[in-house]
A protein has these predicted regions:
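Residues on the lipid-exposed face of transmembrane beta-strands in outer-membrane beta-barrel proteins
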Residues: 48-52, 68-74, 85-90, 128-134, ...
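Predominantly the C-terminal beta-signal and adjacent terminal strand-loop region
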Residues: 228-285
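Outer-membrane beta-barrel transmembrane domain signature
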Residues: 158-237, 245-248
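Outer-envelope beta-barrel architecture signal
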Residues: 38-44, 64-66, 77-79, 92-98, ...
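Short glycine/proline- and aromatic-enriched beta-strand/turn motifs that initiate or cap beta-hairpins
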Residues: 36-80, 275, 285
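Outer-membrane beta-barrel translocator domains and adjoining extracellular loop/strand segments
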Residues: 57-62, 111-116, 157-164, 195-203, ...
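Sequence/structural signature of outer-membrane beta-barrel proteins
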Residues: 51-57, 105-111, 135-139, 151-158, ...
């Protein structure tokens, strides 16, 4: 079976689980955190979680993992990992801020995916790029932002390679309610030709009687919405999220590798926060 790389199988398994751990930590840590007058500069913890995620958007098969979940919060002036996600802050004002943000997708083995049988494996991707955040409104216990992330994507193969770009603007609402920190966001997605091709192209040599050749185009890539909740009780941190994705009407929807028009992703985790810095920093609204 052809693959994108020649990493030994035990290493591939470790890579898949490591990528899944990072993805789950990013989704959950970026969900919401409580606001206080001042907070610890950093916090460390470790827990356990479960994650269900599609092999790729438009796939009718899912990964199901039980994973260790690292809890890492850092509230520095430039580098931060908190309720806004993991990023490097480039500009920070009351209404507008600009940061360098991260994203990614999990790996998938073609032998585990019926639609991709005999095709190259999908490596995990790392997405990185600028994100412009515009504060639209704020009140007691809530805030509404428009977030505009534009990211370059890199496939984590033996020799990492660029696989294009993604743009996924979202409206993001954060709410504090009875000790819970709730987040809701959603918006459309767009991607370049190389990004869509990595996931959805079928070359002439990969075509079969039930899988026609297909060349992806750039453009509209569907939409997604995520809801999440977290709560801190003493040194315990509980978090969960649910995401809905749709590729209906997307330029990639006619690929034979798209076997359903919508996907759901969800995860829950419980972590024990075992170390907190003595240094304190003011909360950033």
């Amino acid at each position: 079976m052809p693959t994108h790389n020649a990493v030994p199988k035990p290493c591939q398994a470790r890579t898949r689980r490591f990528a899944a751990c990072l993805m789950m930590a990013a989704w959950l840590l970026g969900a919401a955190h409580a606001a206080h007058a001042d907070q610890a500069l950093w916090e460390l913890g470790l827990g356990l979680g479960t994650l269900s995620v599609p092999h790729y958007r438009g796939s009718d098969q899912n990964h199901h993992w039980v994973l260790p979940v690292p809890y890492v919060v850092y509230r520095g002036d430039i580098f931060r990992s908190d309720r806004e996600g993991t990023r490097a802050v480039l500009l920070d004002t009351e209404r507008v801020d600009l940061d360098l943000s991260l994203g990614g997708t999990p790996p998938a083995r073609s032998r585990d995916n019926r639609a991709r049988t005999g095709m190259p494996d999908l490596a995990a991707t790392l997405e990185i790029g600028p994100k412009l955040n515009l504060r639209l409104g704020q009140g007691a216990g809530w805030k509404l932002d428009l977030r505009l992330p534009l990211r370059a994507a890199i496939a984590a193969e033996d020799h990492p390679k660029s696989v294009g770009w993604t743009l996924s603007p979202v409206l993001n609402l954060d709410v504090q309610w009875q000790g819970w920190n709730l987040g809701l966001q959603g918006g459309p997605m767009a991607a370049g030709r190389a990004y869509n091709a990595y996931f959805y192209d079928v070359t002439a040599t990969q075509a079969t009687p039930v899988r026609s050749a297909y060349a992806a185009r750039s453009g509209y890539a569907g939409w997604g919405a995520t809801t999440a909740a977290t709560r801190r009780v003493g040194n315990w941190w509980l978090a969960g999220f649910w995401r809905y994705d749709s590729v209906a009407g997307a330029t990639l929807a006619r690929s034979p590798l798209v076997t359903q028009r919508s996907n759901q992703t969800f995860g829950v985790a419980l972590s024990w926060v075992f170390k907190v810095s003595d240094a304190r920093v003011p909360d950033r609204p």
